């Protein structure tokens, strides 16, 4: 072997100080999932999955997670553009507020939502008095709770993509007579589509697994607010086998959806 080939082979070799921690991290992530599959009650799984409550909770989870993601897109993308493309006093403070739900315990987020949108809340009392709208302990409340915890993932992803995108394309469009909104819609949005897609996937995954804010703000009512994570928690108290079966369903759905969307959007990127 020539010296140049040996040098190239050495350059491609994975350093042991990086390989060992990487394998430990991979094992840490995979072992709990493997344990879930190994300890699953496979013989009784068909009976567990035949329960109407399972599919009711799964259907509600998918509906609420998708609705929360769409709501996050509608308000989150403009918010990310505002943070990335405009200068205004207190922008850093606003950015900190947007990312606060990432570090806030979900239960605290649920309490905050109750104080804001509950029947006696700052906003909720007026919604109830003027329009007869009650949000807590409803399916809409589940969507709001999931949006609260999931939207920061979308905003961070889209803002990062906007900062990496060259603003001169947008400026050129406005120079040619396009309004700033038209330039955003026709030029900027197609450029940042992969970042928007990645943020939407992260938001959807976070919404699908949301527990703390949901049970605090929306409760745990089968058919109305009981999503899959809540159903797993409830089953774990009385029927661990059912909890494992529900966990497997949620795991399978999450892997299938996220893997499919990731491959599709990574190719588009």
List each language-model region with its residue ranges.
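Short coil/turn motifs that cap or connect alpha-helices
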Residues: 89, 179-180
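The alpha-helix within a helix-turn-helix
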Residues: 173
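Glycine/proline-centered hinge or cleavage motifs at structural transition points of membrane proteins
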Residues: 176-178, 190
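Short, intrinsically disordered terminal tails adjacent to the first/last structured region
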Residues: 1-4
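Short glycine/proline-centered loop/turn elements that form peptide/ligand docking sites
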Residues: 165-169
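Membrane-water interface segments at the C-terminal ends of transmembrane alpha-helices
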Residues: 9-43, 52-163, 187, 191-212, ...
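Short hydrophobic, aromatic-rich alpha-helical segments embedded in or entering the lipid bilayer
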Residues: 221-236
